[in-house]
Amino acid sequence: MKGLAAALLVLVCTMALCSCAQVGTNKELCCLVYTSWQIPQKFIVDYSETSPQCPKPGVILLTKRGRQICADPNKKWVQKYISDLKLNA
């Protein structure tokens, strides 16, 4: 069962990774699609907010493995992760 959960997490992360796109010449990342799953907080090490030039707001969560996952900044779990990361900075 743990193997299935791990495989599902990898699949979700891969799908979320494909939801970031570069905009403009300054290589700013924008979120086209947000992850539909709450990523376990223990995997998140940093975050960045997308540029105001992006079509919609987003938070790019950085995982321990260096993957970037787009998340909805209005979700409570995303706001909690950001708050916790700021406290531990």
Curated annotation (Swiss-Prot):
SMART domains: SCY. The Cys-30/Cys-54 disulfide bond is required for activity. SUPFAM superfamilies: Interleukin 8-like chemokines. Induction: Specifically induced in macrophages by IL4/interleukin-4, IL13/interleukin-13, and IL10/interleukin-10. Expression is inhibited by IFNG/IFN-gamma while glucocorticoids exert a slightly positive synergistic effect in combination with IL4/interleukin-4. Strongly induced in several human cell lines, including monocytic U-937 cells, by phorbol myristate acetate (PMA). Induced in PBMC by staphylococcal enterotoxins SEA and SEB. InterPro entries: Chemokine_b/g/d, Chemokine_CC_CS, Chemokine_IL8-like_dom, Interleukin_8-like_sf. Disulfide bonds join C30-C54, C31-C70. The keyword Secreted applies. One of its GO terms (molecular function) is chemokine activity. One of its GO terms (biological process) is inflammatory response. Expressed at high levels in lung, lymph nodes, placenta, bone marrow, dendritic cells present in germinal centers and T-cell areas of secondary lymphoid organs and macrophages derived from peripheral blood monocytes. Not expressed by peripheral blood monocytes and a monocyte-to-macrophage differentiation is a prerequisite for expression. Expressed in synovial fluids from patients with rheumatoid and septic arthritis and in ovarian carcinoma ascitic fluid. Residues 1-20 form the signal peptide. One of its GO terms (cellular component) is extracellular space. It is found in: Secreted. Keywords: Chemotaxis, Cytokine, Disulfide bond, Inflammatory response, Secreted, Signal. Coiled coil: none annotated. The keyword Ion transport does not apply. Belongs to the intercrine beta (chemokine CC) family. PANTHER family: C-C MOTIF CHEMOKINE 18, SMALL INDUCIBLE CYTOKINE A. Chemotactic factor that attracts lymphocytes but not monocytes or granulocytes. May be involved in B-cell migration into B-cell follicles in lymph nodes. Attracts naive T-lymphocytes toward dendritic cells and activated macrophages in lymph nodes, has chemotactic activity for naive T-cells, CD4+ and CD8+ T-cells and thus may play a role in both humoral and cell-mediated immunity responses. This is C-C motif chemokine 18. It comes from Homo sapiens. The lineage of its organism: Eukaryota, Metazoa, Chordata, Craniata, Vertebrata. The gene is CCL18.
